[in-house]
Every structure is written in C-alpha cells, then in structure tokens.
C-alpha cells in the first residue's frame, strides 16, 4: 500500500515557499533516473527551461549544493541511506529570506534498521553495508 502510494507520485512537483519557487525532483529535472553526482562537470547541470529558484533532488544520496545559471541545485543527501557515512541522516535547511543553505548531519543508531533489514529481507546485504559505513 505504501509502495503503491510512492510509485504513484509525480516525477516532479513545483511548489512555492517563502516567496521562492522550488522544483522537487528525484534524479534530475529532465530524467527521474539520472544520477547527478557532486563531482559531475558543469554541463551536467545545464538545464534549460527551469522556472525555479531552487531545484531539490536526491537519487544519488550524496549531499551537494551547486549554483546553476538561473537556480541553485540542492541535494540534501539521504536521511536513511547516506552514502558518505553510515549512521548519519543528511538534511538541509534553506532560509528563503537570505538564501543561505545549511547542510546538516544528524547521527542515529543504525542497529534497529539493520535488524529490520535482516528480519524482512536477509538477502539485503547491500543496504546493510551502506548503513554500516
């Protein structure tokens, strides 16, 4: 039921908050399955036709902030499957009044999550490795 709800979500969503326009997408504004890594070349972030102040995305689980020609691209990382360090939830705060983006890391106990992985799918070794980094 929850998975069906997630699968039914749109690839993108435009929202306004604090007088700023946000485009929310998973992989990139042009492809929900595209990986945009922090070390990608500048042309990888050259999207035309974006009508937003901020583009928020995920997919890679790596935190990044990149200024593009007309917008700021932000990947806060991952709350549950951070790629840089296990046991840390990555997230950010965007201050729409002064356009300051503050990247955050919050440690959490991975033991209950690993136990759930082992209980519900003992073949999920990759996720357990990610969580234990």
Enumerate the language-model features and the residues they cover:
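Acidic, His/Gly-rich catalytic cores of divalent-metal-dependent hydrolytic chemistry
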Residues: 66-133
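Active-site environment of divalent metal-dependent phosphoester hydrolases
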Residues: 30-32, 56-67, 81-86
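Conserved catalytic scaffold of divalent metal-dependent phosphoesterases
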Residues: 1-54
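Short, acidic/polar N-cap/turn motifs at the starts of alpha helices
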Residues: 10-14, 62-63, 89-91
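Charged, low-complexity, helix/coiled-coil-prone segments
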Residues: 32-33, 37-40, 60-62, 123, ...
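Active-site neighborhood of phospho(di)ester-bond hydrolases with catalytic His/Asp-centered motifs
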Residues: 25, 54-59, 73-77
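Glycine-rich, charged/polar anion/phosphate-binding loops
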Residues: 9-11, 60, 78-80
């Amino acid at each position: 039921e929850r998975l069906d709800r997630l699968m039914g979500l749109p690839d993108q969503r435009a929202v306004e908050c604090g007088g700023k326009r946000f485009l929310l997408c998973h992989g990139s504004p042009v492809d929900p399955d595209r990986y945009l890594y922090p070390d990608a070349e500048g042309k990888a972030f050259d999207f035309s036709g974006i009508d937003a102040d901020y583009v928020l995305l995920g997919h890679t689980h790596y935190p990044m902030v990149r200024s593009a020609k007309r917008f700021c691209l932000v990947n806060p990382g991952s709350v549950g499957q951070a790629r840089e360090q296990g046991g840390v939830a990555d997230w950010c705060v965007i201050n729409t009044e002064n356009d300051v983006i503050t990247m955050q890391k919050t440690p959490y106990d991975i033991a209950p999550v690993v136990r759930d992985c082992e209980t519900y799918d003992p073949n999920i070794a990759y996720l357990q490795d990610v969580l234990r980094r």
